Every structure is written in structure tokens, then in C-alpha cells.
Swiss-Prot record:
Its EC number is 2.7.4.1. Mg(2+) binds at residues 431, 461. It comes from Mycobacterium tuberculosis (strain ATCC 25618 / H37Rv). It catalyses: [phosphate](n) + ATP = [phosphate](n+1) + ADP. ATP binds at residues 91, 524, 624, 652. One of its GO terms (cellular component) is polyphosphate kinase complex. Residues 726-742 have a biased composition (Basic and acidic residues). One of its GO terms (molecular function) is polyphosphate kinase activity. Belongs to the polyphosphate kinase 1 (PPK1) family. Pfam families: PP_kinase, PP_kinase_C, PP_kinase_C_1, PP_kinase_N. Keywords: ATP-binding, Kinase, Magnesium, Metal-binding, Nucleotide-binding, Phosphoprotein, Transferase. An intermediate of this reaction is the autophosphorylated ppk in which a phosphate is covalently linked to a histidine residue through a N-P bond. This is Polyphosphate kinase.
């Protein structure tokens, strides 16, 4: 067990040498000539306090804590709780691979640029380490003390080797020798065998063995294979009545793979004594950049960088909390890990593998099955009607997963591919599924002789390999594949279909908030606009020309496009909302801004919202993840509330509403630097009153005082809402009931 003393990090011991300018204030003595008084501020309302931002990294950890709260919620179906434990773990892995890795790189390079809330990279790393250790311990305790016993009560057991009887051990001996032993490679460490490379996110056993002859001890590492199931399913047993109720259900029993390997270490090290063994796991830096302006072939350059990703420097070491001091010291030394990057975990490491447990066939322990409904505009009729005919009658707003993706957006692309009157299809692809029907439709369209353009973002993090494969498949089919603009990720969700209709050419469009991915569309909440509006069609034509050619159009008719137009466009609308509010009078103004997004970090947008709040505009923010805005602070944000909704579906849509100026916008951009400065993003205005009424209903549901959520306080703390004793409604459940297929 690692002592608290050893956990004192360099972050705490090393003084921060950077001093802020205000700490060098010079005060003259009594005999010196005093400076003139400071200038009176021109506008007090424009002066914003320096502590107005919350730290974005700590806010992300708060988001993951909300995920963990769902896992701890005993009102949730049991296997859904296990699922949220897995999501928490995989979320934290990615946070360390990207965000923590970036902070460590800046710290190691001596780049002491402070965050918006005034912290250096080293100070942030210190706070992240402390908060992560607390969260990791809580995560483990929710599993060990709550979810694991509850699984046992339902006849689902995760057992240890000590729990098995001799017959089970004999069967597992055969399984080990036939299925596991051949793929294991025990690696010794001695003068002839250097310390082995440990790949990122792999689960390993650190083993100490002793030679019986002279008592010499040696270290060895055994990697738990990642191409076999983490949990070995044992032969079924009849569950006890207590565990399985009166149904006589057989018990499901699983043994962690590391337990099986540990039991057979003598087979791996014959003739040696096993002194100790402990599980550990390393996380490596996966935050890399491709020098696009230097490399002629972006695809090849990206493939080279992907090959290097597995060799990134360590950013976190997770260890079982029973690991000895000597074993840990060896790992720290050989892996070049700082003590401050060690996370002690009670029980099992890497609970992301609980997805395997979630997959068991126990529907009563999961959310009730939900089948998305076909949007009424696209419902089957006695006389078949194409999507194009429907869109000629009017725009359609789809809300996934409540409205089926496959019978709306996917069908839109599939009909375009099969329609002989369609001349061209242009589409952006950021993340798509492994067997994507969208991509297959584009391939079919190209093979049918249509002009097909696909903007494939091969730099979509952790989906690079899949997107490279799709890009090559599309090119082989004759699709014109482009990778967007140098230095920018193409993150917008847009599709354009050009169709000949008699003597005219008509353009049909889709602008959405979510990816063209039929699998995640069943799990992610998103909205999309399907339209034949000429102005949006002309805008998307200009946008695709700028992405595939040398056009550098910066202004559009009905779109806001990053990196040049979204931040300025939003701030302009906030200011217009303030002006409209003031024009109505201090007590009669109807200024109200409602925002729904994944993250709110951009300081310029936040400051614009603060100024609007000071002017009396009511502001309501629904944010899934990071929020750097501090709501409810006296003198700056009394008129701002921030709430977060998490649940069965991942809230992914980005929607903006400015009531006084009567504008609704949807699109792909969150309010983050990367979205507004380093990505091609699109926001589209929704003008049809029938569709804006749908968006208004969505906001009203999310902001209902009885809606189950968390609310952010001025101190940066999130609080569950509503309080006990009040009626509670579930935002997503209410939408499912409204859209549920008959």
C-alpha cells in the first residue's frame, strides 16, 4: 500500500516561480512624488472580475463525477449502473491521454502560460491528481460496495480464484493450457533482458519470482492479453433462491482474466517461487499533431503519427492498492513515472471492461427497449412519397434518437444515391460506423455515375484508422475524397444533394449537430434540419467549394461558419439581444437567451453572456460537460443559471435561442476554442415557426424546474436537482414517451 508521504508530489514541493505583474506593485515613500489618480472606468458594467472563470480541466472531472453519480444511483437499472462505471473509466482514460498529456508537455517545456482561471500547468496537474485519486477511490467503492453485491443478488457474480471449487479449478486448468497459455509472453528483467515496453491501457501483472537455490529475486511482467475477454465465463450454477428469486434462474459467474493468469504463474515460471504479483496499468500520451503544412500526403503523415502514438510518454500509472513499496519503486523507475501520476485503486483495475457484464442477456436489469419512431413527415403512406417531395412541401426538423435516423437522414442519402435524377451528393464525414450504410450509399452513388464528394476528417481523434480505411474505400469507388483545409478539422455535419427537376436544378440539404453514424444515432441526442431552402443550398454549395477548392468565402446567407464566423456571430446576437431588451425598458424587457451544448469554455462568449446578465437578460444554459462560466455570482451573473442533464442518451445537440431578436440556431459547434478557432463548424438558423416551436418545447422540457438534473452554483459546485420532497420528471423519458413507436 502506498503511504501518504510517498504521494507528496513534485507539484507540491516545487515552488511556482512565475510571479504575476500585480505582485510587483511599487509604492513610493512619503517624500516621493505620487502618481496621478487612476482613470475612472468609462463603463463599470464592462469591468469583469478576474475570478469569473472556472477551471476547464477540473470542470471536466466534475462532469465525470456526474457520470459516476449515475452509477451510484440505486434507482437506475442495475446493468445500466455497471455501464456507467465502464463509461466513467473510459472517459478518464481519454482525459489523461489527451488533456493531462497536453498539460504535462507544456510543463516539461517550461511553458507557464496560465489557464483562464489563473493556474499554471503544474498547478493544474497537482489539482487534477488529487481530484482523480478521490474519484478513482469513489469509483472503486461504488463497484465493490454497491454494484458488485447487487449483481450477486441478481445471480451475476464476479468471483475470485479462492471462490472456486476443485472441479471448477480443474476445468479452468484445461482452459488456461489450451486457450490462454499459448498467447502469454512472460518477460523477465535482468542484465540480459531490459525492462519490456508496456503499451498504453494494457493490463499487466508485475511479478516477483525467487530462485530456490540462492534466494535471488527477479522481476517479470506478464501482459493480460487484450484479444480475449477480460472475464472468463464459468459453467452455470443454479442460483440460490435469495439470488435468483423464485424463477430458478441459473447464476452467471465470471472470473477476471488476471485472476486466472495469477493462479497459473507457476506454469509460466516453472522451477521458480512466486513471491508476489500485483496488477498495474499505464496510460500514455496520445495527444499528437500532424505537421500538415510540411507534409504533402496528409494520410501518410497521419499513419506515421498513429504508429508513434503507442510509444507516447507515460501520463498515469494505476496500481492495485496492495502493491508493495519495493514493487512500486521499481515500476516508477523503469517506466519513468512521477509519484504524482500514480493512482491507487482498490479492487479491479480497468472497469471499462464491465461492458462485457452489461452484455449479458438480462433485459429486466436494463433500460426498457426503445425503438425510435419514424418522423411523421416521412411516415409510410398509401401512396409512396419520396423525401424530396416531402422537403419541397416544407422543412423538417428531426430529433434523434427519438426520431429514427435510419428512416430520415440515412434514407435521405440512400434515396439520393438511387435516384436517377440526382446529379451530385456532397457530404462531410467525421465519425461513422464500421459498417456505415451512409458510406455504402455514397459508394453506390459514385458507381452509378453520380458526382460524389466526401469530406473525410481523418484526424478525428481515436477514429483515425477507421476514417483512413473509409477514405481509401471511397476513393477506390470513384468518390472525390478531400481531407478539408490545412490546419483545421472539418467537424461540421452537412450534406448537399443536387437534383434535376425538369428544366431546373434544386438543392436539398441536411445540417445537423451529430455525426452521420447510424449506431451512435441510437445513443446520442441530436437535432438536424432537412430543407430545400435555396439560401441554405447556396450556402452549402459555397462551403463545399471552399473545402475542396481554393475558395475562401467568409460570409454566408443563412449559416455561421467557423473558424471565422461563429464566435463573432454569437457575440453579435448576444449584444443585439441586450439592445432589444433595453429598448423595452428595464422592467419590461423580454431578453432571454437559452443555450444547449456539450461545453462552454470560450472566454469571449462567456464574457458576452456576463455583460448580458448585468443588463438584465435572463440566460439559461444546458451543458452536458465542461462549463467555465460561473453562474449566480453577485454583480456579474445573477441572471444566469446552468444545469446539466445526463442519462440514457448522451446529450449532444447544440441549440441557441435569442428570444428578443427571435432567432433559433442549431449546429456542430460547442463554445470552445478548438471549435471556434481550429475547426470548420456550421450553425444554421431555423426559421420555420413550426420547427422553432419544436426547439422551444425541447428547451422548456430541459429547463422545467422538475426536470432531473444538476445545477451549477457560483462556487463551482454541482448540486442534484430537484431537492428531495419535490416532484421529479425525467427529460429523456418524457421525450421517449412522446416519440415511442406504437
Amino acid at each position: 500500500m502506498m503511504s501518504n508521504d510517498r504521494k507528496v508530489t513534485e507539484i507540491e514541493n516545487s515552488p511556482v516561480t512565475e510571479v504575476r505583474p500585480e505582485e510587483h506593485a511599487w509604492y513610493p515613500d512619503d517624500s516621493a512624488l505620487a502618481a496621478p489618480p487612476a482613470a475612472t472606468p468609462a463603463a463599470i458594467s464592462d469591468q469583469l472580475p478576474s475570478d469569473r472563470y472556472l477551471n476547464r480541466e477540473l470542470s471536466w472531472l466534475d462532469f465525470n463525477a456526474r457520470v459516476l453519480a449515475l452509477a451510484a444511483d440505486k434507482s437506475m437499472p442495475l446493468l445500466e449502473r455497471a455501464k456507467f462505471l465502464a463509461i466513467f473509466a473510459s472517459n478518464l482514460d481519454e482525459f489523461y491521454m489527451v488533456r493531462v498529456a497536453g498539460l504535462k508537455r507544456r510543463d516539461e517545456m517550461g511553458l507557464s502560460v496560465r489557464s483562464a482561471d489563473g493556474l499554471t500547468p503544474r498547478e493544474q496537474l497537482g489539482r487534477i491528481g488529487e481530484q482523480t485519486q478521490q474519484l478513482a477511490s469513489r469509483h472503486a467503492r461504488v463497484f465493490l460496495d454497491s454494484v458488485l453485491p447487487a449483481l450477486g443478488e441478481e445471480g451475476i457474480y464476479i468471483v475470485t480464484w479462492a471462490d472456486l471449487d476443485q472441479a471448477e479449478r480443474d476445468r479452468l486448468s484445461t482452459y488456461f493450457n489450451e486457450q490462454v497459455f499459448p498467447v502469454l509472453t512472460p518477460l523477465a528483467v535482468d542484465p540480459a533482458h531490459p525492462f519490456p515496453f508496456v503499451s498504453g491501457l494494457s493490463l499487466n501483472l508485475a511479478v516477483t519470482v525467487r530462485q530456490p537455490e540462492d534466494g535471488t529475486q527477479h522481476f517479470a511482467r506478464v501482459k493480460v492479453p487484450d484479444n480475449v475477454d477480460r472475464f472468463v465465463e464459468l459453467a452455470a450454477r443454479e442460483a440460490s433462491e435469495e439470488a435468483a428469486g423464485t424463477e430458478g434462474r441459473t447464476a452467471l459467474r465470471f472470473l477476471p482474466m488476471e485472476e486466472l493468469i495469477a493462479a497459473f504463474l507457476p506454469v509460466l515460471f516453472p522451477g521458480m517461487e512466486i513471491v508476489e504479483h500485483h496488477a498495474f496499468r499505464i496510460t500514455r500520451n496520445a495527444d499528437f499533431e500532424v505537421e500538415e503544412d510540411r507534409d504533402e500526403d496528409l494520410l501518410q503523415a497521419l499513419e506515421r503519427e498513429l504508429a508513434r502514438r503507442r510509444f507516447g510518454s507515460p501520463v498515469r500509472l494505476e496500481i492495485a492498492d496492495d502493491m508493495t513499496e519495493s514493487m512500486l519503486e521499481l515500476l516508477l523507475r523503469e517506466l519513468d513515472v512521477h509519484p504524482g501520476d500514480v493512482i491507487e485503486v482498490p479492487g479491479l483495475l480497468d472497469l471499462s471492461s464491465l461492458w462485457q457484464i452489461y452484455a449479458v442477456d438480462r433485459p429486466t436489469l436494463k433500460d426498457r427497449t426503445f425503438v425510435p419512431a419514424t418522423h411523421p413527415a416521412f411516415a409510410e403512406r398509401e401512396t409512396p412519397k419520396s423525401i424530396f417531395a416531402t422537403l419541397r412541401e416544407g422543412d423538417v426538423l428531426v430529433h434523434h434518437p427519438y426520431d429514427s435516423f435510419s428512416t430520415s437522414v440515412q434514407r435521405f442519402i440512400e434515396q439520393a444515391a438511387a435516384d436517377p435524377n440526382v446529379l451530385a451528393i456532397k457530404q462531410t464525414l467525421y465519425r461513422t460506423s464500421g459498417d456505415s450504410p451512409i458510406v455504402r450509399a455514397l459508394i453506390d452513388a459514385a458507381e452509378a455515375g453520380k458526382q460524389v464528394v466526401a469530406l473525410v476528417e481523418i484526424k478525428a481523434r481515436f477514429d483515425e484508422q477507421a476514417n483512413i480505411a473509409w477514405a481509401r474505400a471511397l476513393e477506390q469507388a470513384g468518390v472525390h475524397v478531400a481531407y478539408g483545409l490545412v490546419g483545421l478539422k472539418t467537424h461540421c455535419k452537412t450534406a448537399l444533394v443536387v437534383r434535376r427537376e425538369g428544366p431546373t436544378i434544386r438543392r436539398y440539404c441536411h445540417v445537423g449537430t451529430g455525426n452521420y453514424n447510424s449506431k451512435t444515432a441510437r445513443l446520442y441526442e441530436d437535432v438536424g434540419l432537412l430543407t430545400a431552402a435555396p439560401d441554405i443550398g447556396a450556402d452549402l454549395t459555397d462551403l463545399f467549394n471552399s473545402l475542396t477548392g481554393y475558395s475562401r468565402k467568409l460570409s454566408y446567407r443563412n449559416l455561421l461558419v467557423a473558424p471565422h464566423g461563429i464566435r463573432a456571430g454569437i457575440i453579435d446576437r448576444v449584444e443585439r439581444e441586450v439592445a432589444a431588451h433595453r429598448a423595452e425598458g428595464a422592467h419590461n424587457g423580454k431578453g432571454r437567451i437559452r443555450l444547449k451544448m456539450n461545453a462552454l469554455v470560450d472566454e469571449q462568449v462567456i464574457d458576452a453572456l456576463y455583460r448580458a446578465s448585468r443588463a438584465g437578460v435572463r440566460i439559461e444554459v444546458v451543458v452536458r460537460g465542461i462549463c467555465a462560466l460561473r453562474p449566480g455570482a453577485q454583480g456579474i451573473s445573477e441572471n444566469i443559471i446552468v444545469r446539466s442533464i445526463l442519462g440514457r442518451f448522451l446529450e449532444h445537440s447544440r441549440i441557441l435561442h435569442f428570444r428578443a431578436i427571435d432567432e433559433f440556431w442549431i449546429g456542430s459547434a460547442d463554445m470552445m476554442h478548438r471549435n471556434l478557432d481550429r475547426r470548420v463548424e456550421v450553425m444554421a438558423q431555423v426559421k420555420n415557426p413550426r420547427l422553432t416551436a419544436q426547439l422551444d418545447e425541447l428547451f422548456e422540457s430541459a429547463l422545467d424546474p422538475c426536470t432531473r438534473c444538476w445545477e451549477l452554483g457560483p462556487d463551482g459546485q454541482w448540486t442534484a436537482s430537484p431537492q428531495e420532497g419535490h416532484s421529479v420528471r425525467d427529460h429523456q423519458e418524457s421525450l421517449m414517451e412522446r416519440h415511442r413507436s406504437p
